[in-house]
Amino acid sequence: MIGPLVKLALTTALVSILFSNPTAAQVLPPAKKAARVAITKGPVLELVSDYLTFFRWITTNPGGSDVHFGIVHYGTDPKDLSQTAKSEVRVNRGHPETMFRVSVEGLKPRTTYYYKVTSTESGGKSDGVESPISQFTTPKS
């Protein structure tokens, strides 16, 4: 006859094994990478203040890794967009589009900035999408 402490130990070990080792049904394979990713809406400036701006844009679902990054490349010279800001987004495999939202901070008042947006997979590989260069001017403080 097995004592109650041994039964408890065996039950605990079994539960631990069952829940710590995910089965194939629990871990989804990476989504198929889209053949072509395109910006379908935006980029739109949601807010422009003297020091902060929010950018939002929507692309077709890029697939691939579950985590992607929206990146804003910006600067005061349209030929030098070397400053960047990025934000992580989780891709919803069941949705045809993905929304990116990135904040850019530390801007100067009454300054014209040029920008473009791109996106990448979590490993840094480009989604192959890039907006045209646009501009905005921050208001005075």
Give, region by region, the residue ranges found by the protein language model:
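Bacterial N-terminal signal peptides that target proteins for export
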Residues: M1-L10
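Sec/Tat signal peptide C-region and signal peptidase I cleavage site
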Residues: N21-A25
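Bacterial N-terminal signal peptides
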Residues: A9-S20
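Short, surface-exposed linear motifs at loops/turns and structural transition points
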Residues: Q26-S141
